From Swiss-Prot:
GO biological process, one term: symbiont-mediated suppression of host innate immune response
Entry's free-text remark on domains: The PSAP motif is necessary for the release of membrane-wrapped virions from infected cells.
Region: Hydrophobic, residue numbers: 6-22, 33-53
Compartments, record wording: Host endoplasmic reticulum membrane; Host cytoplasm, Host cytoskeleton; Virion; Host cell membrane
Entry superkingdom: Viruses
Renumbered residue ranges of the record's region Interaction with host SRC, HCK, FYN, PIK3R3 and GRB2: 95-104
Annotated stretches, region: Disordered: 91-114
Residue interval(s) of motif PTAP/PSAP motif: 96-99
Cystines in this chain: none
UniProt entry tagged with the keyword Ubl conjugation: no
Role description: Small multifunctional phosphoprotein involved in virion morphogenesis, egress and counteracting host innate immunity. Plays critical roles in the final steps of viral release by interacting with host TSG101, a member of the vacuolar protein-sorting pathway and using other cellular host proteins involved in vesicle formation pathway. Also acts as a viroporin and forms ion conductive pores allowing viral particle release. Impairs the generation of type I interferon by down-regulating host TLR3 and TLR7 as well as their downstream signaling pathways.
Name of this protein: Protein ORF3
Main location: host cell
Highest classification ranks of the organism: Viruses, Riboviria, Orthornavirae, Kitrinoviricota, Alsuviricetes
Length: 114
């Protein structure tokens, strides 16, 4: 994972970005020739979605774009939980606003099947 010189004599940090001139990412270097001098082009390279950044004549890097935040399954529940105070009660102590738990009914144990 360390930085090693790429074909242009620059250092490639393969852990954070994909240097298109790096020998490790040689199949991707064809994309750099197609893109040319584009400023920021969305691309999918070996399953990673990112932006191709080429600020100047330097080699083109693809930095992965952050994934969008996960939306809650039920949008109304986040408002309900946001209004509740964040006081943690000791174990075994219930809040007065909490609904009572249903009574547990013991079921008869079944004998071993034959």
């Amino acid at each position: 994972m360390g930085s090693r010189p790429c074909d242009l004599g620059l250092f490639c940090c393969c852990s954070s970005c994909f240097c298109l001139c790096c020998p490790r990412h040689r199949p991707v270097s064809r994309l750099a020739a197609v893109v040319g001098g584009a400023a920021a082009v969305p691309a999918v390279v070996s399953g990673v979605t990112g932006l191709i950044l080429s600020p100047s004549q330097s080699p083109i890097f693809i930095q992965p774009t952050p994934s969008p935040p996960m939306s809650p399954l039920r949008p109304g529940l986040d408002l309900v939980f946001a209004n509740q105070p964040d006081h943690s009660a000791p174990l075994g102590v219930t809040r007065p606003s909490a609904p009572p738990l249903p009574h547990v009914v013991d079921l008869p144990q079944l004998g071993p099947r034959r």
